[in-house]
């Protein structure tokens, strides 16, 4: 499974985070970690997500860019993760 670090800049509305997380889930990605902080102007937020999926991150990138409140999406890093099964 691939892990991707995604940075999203968006307008600060109560429903914005919900919409971003719904798109991530509907596109088949799992949230491994998340950090959200208000931008310096207090009207925008910066969301840092680490997501995992065998799917291409390009689909998630294009779908997040279509959201009304999203101003910018950047894919910063991709890494491969291995899953261990213990008996």
Swiss-Prot record:
Gene3D superfamilies: 3.30.70.260. Residues 5-78 form the ACT domain. Its cofactor is Mg(2+); thiamine diphosphate. Keywords: Amino-acid biosynthesis, Branched-chain amino acid biosynthesis, Magnesium, Thiamine pyrophosphate, Transferase. InterPro entries: ACT-like_dom_sf, ACT_dom. GO terms for biological process: amino acid biosynthetic process; branched-chain amino acid biosynthetic process; isoleucine biosynthetic process; L-valine biosynthetic process. It holds the Pfam family ACT_5. One of its GO terms (molecular function) is acetolactate synthase activity. E.coli contains genes for 3 AHAS isozymes: ilvBN, ilvGM and ilvIH. Tetramer of two large and two small chains. This is Acetolactate synthase isozyme 2 small subunit. It comes from Escherichia coli (strain K12).
